[in-house]
Amino acid sequence: MEKSFYTYNEPSFVSAKGNGGQDFSAQEVLVIDGTTSGWLKIISYEGEKWINPNASEVSGVIELALKQLGKPYVFGESGPNSFDCSGFIYYVYKNNGYSISRNSVAGYWPMVIKINDPQPGDLVFLQNTYTPGPSHMGIYLGNGEFIHAGSEQTGVVRGNVFSSYNQKHFLGYGRFKK
């Protein structure tokens, strides 16, 4: 994503080109009205809109994660041919420029910024799945869907955050600082 933001008292100007998203120019934007979880709220002639200045980073995370669909789950592995859930996270984010170390789910949970409004590329954490406390994680894709290294039976698969099993074990959403 190419991005440049120039703000003045009134009006504010934005020029942004998103990956597969909408282009915004200074003529279309009246005011940058604030941010929420890294998204910019802008007021344009067409009404309120949201843009993500980090969309290219997020799309890289999701693109690499989706390329791993169907790969096997192997406990303790962190790619590129097999993964456990935290190894999957490590592989995808590390290969997208995030400075993180290989850790367990319980180790990642205290490192992330806790959020309530997940965006694609954020993390989904589950607890008490096979051990007490934070024990499973995946990458949020949007619309309640996430991708994760599920089990030896499933490998890397898509899942639904709102399934009864995941809701029973849901811990929260998180976001890595880059």
Where are these regions (language model features)?
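Boundary regions of SH3-family modules and the immediately adjacent low-complexity/disordered segments
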Residues: 43-63
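SH3/SH3-like beta-barrel fold
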Residues: 40-44, 146
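Catalytic cysteine-centered active-site loop
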Residues: 68-120, 170
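Loop/turn positions that initiate beta-strands
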Residues: 27, 121-122
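Beta-loop motif signature
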Residues: 1-41
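Aromatic- and glycine-rich peptidoglycan recognition patches
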Residues: 6, 15, 19, 56, ...
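Disulfide-bonded cysteine-rich modules in secreted/extracellular proteins
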Residues: 1, 58-72
